[in-house]
Amino acid sequence: MNVPLALAALTAQAAEPARLREIPYNYTSFSDREIVLRLLGARAWEILAQLRTERHTGRSARMLYEVLGDIWVVRRNPYLQDDLLDNPRRRRLLVEALHHRLAEIEKRRTPQDDPARDAMVGELLAAARRAVEAFDRSFAKVAELRRRAARSLSRHTHKDNIKFDGLSRVSHVTDATDWRVEFPLVVLTPDTEAEMAALVKGCIELGLTIIPRGGGTGYTGGAIPLDWKSAVINTEKLITLGAVERIRLPGLDREVPTIHTEAGVVTQRVADAAEAAGLVFACDPTSAEASCIGGNIAMNAGGKKAVLWGTALDNLASWRMVTPEGEWLEVTRLNHNLGKIHDAELASFELKYFDASGQRALRTERLDIPGATFRKAGLGKDVTDKFLAGLPGVQKEGCDGLITSARWVLHRMPEHTRTVCLEFFGHAKDAVPSIVEIKDFMFAEARRTGVLLAGLEHLDDRYLRAVGYTTKSKRGGLPKMVLIGDITGDDPDAVARAASEVVRIANSRSGEGFTAVAADARKKFWADRKKTAAISRHTNAFKINEDVVIPLPRMAEYTDGIERINIELSLRNKIELAGEL
């Protein structure tokens, strides 16, 4: 991906006593400093900071800020950009007005009074003139690039799927993070999987950064354009969902249930299709009702069922993607162990490359990777390992290609399930070890009676406060920690005994346990886990999450450490506020 500014400019957080907002028409989250860095450069901000202490009337500064404000409001509003592209006369008048303001600043210069100060003003004016000229030239550049893109890409998809309009660009400037950097040049919404490779190749020839996008539910900013010369390829029209099929996978001697999906299929639809056939789709992230299959693969998504069947990687039989070279790549798992991939001594994959038409085979490769490579000892999923032993597509967040479809292995859910909700009111340090105790007990129970822990989720007190959690215990007040888990098996008595023992473990750690048997009651227990959007409301609607993996034995230490950081930062903020009074 391209970056919006030089790294040095981003890291050089020069002393900025306040997020100054002197630039007019700036209704974005960017401060004056950030706008000046983008339009004029770091040197201009240094000059402005120095001249700010030497203002007399401030008129020249106001006129300069008006110039920057006019440029900025157009740059951040695709509708204004389209209007100015369609009206050359209006655009010419705007540019003339910008030059007029700069000329008025020029007239107010007094080199005879303070030559050093005047030299800085001259340097600032030169940077502003360059910015206005670049602003003027940008319209011709954008118009030409749009013409080339429309001509090139319309050979491979319907012209209505090539979107330059303001609504499409605004809709694709951010994802669930609400972080906005640049508006994409174009949004592509292909009708079929077959169109993908040619579109990718066309974008590469045009010099565009390609950003795959599905449901836009990510909290890591993976679908956010960082450069204006970018094309967002939206896969939401790729919604073909096959029937559940029992097929013999390569290297296996029996048929297994699978389902084929295109990248734009919403995760919950796949889960519903599997459930209708009496089976389970193991990939169930919190965003299942909005996220798409392509993103699940790109992020190697998990969910509560990952305890039992692993993440997306563990459950993929095969997948299809477009490489950055515009070629088709089909990846097929060989000798699938139908369980967690790290339990297999060797995980083998066949990679078949085809040209953009998908008809001519180019080459075939084979990857044989030790299963243990895919997990980190003591942690499980290693979120820092984007290379993942060279396996394409999975956990790459769209950086090595665009996933278009996949075939998944489905599983049989045991007949009886109970959901337990455990509320802990003691100190977090005392409550957290119960997670390890429950896990160890359930893993031993699985070997002894076949009863399985099909999911286990941890909710801390800050999350509970954000989602408005309703305490089930009669104690009142919010718990310090909540655990929600599914216990499942074919023997109803064994499941009931296991659930009771889990509740007993919670009782020994200042906790209380509640068990749900009916499907509706179980769904209510899990409802609070899906209220992730409430966190965004609780944090001023801006949320970037990078996944972290915590070793369970050190969970208590982690919880206390995070709480300490929160308290220290809160106190520091209060002290600074008090000092300003």
Would you name each region that the model predicts?
Residues 2-201, 218-258, 286, 409-410, ...:
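N-terminal flexible segment immediately upstream of the FAD-binding catalytic core
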Residues 158-166, 281-286, 364-369, 373-381, ...:
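Flexible, glycine/charged-enriched surface loops at secondary-structure junctions
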Residues 162-166, 188-190, 210-214, 221, ...:
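General beta-strand structural signal in soluble alpha/beta enzymes
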Residues 204-209, 238-244, 251-252, 276-281, ...:
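Secondary-structure transition/capping motifs at alpha-helix termini
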Residues 241-251, 257-437:
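FAD-binding subdomain of flavoenzyme oxidoreductases
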Residues 318, 418-439, 443, 447, ...:
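Glycine-rich, acidic/polar active-site loops that bind/position phosphate-bearing ligands
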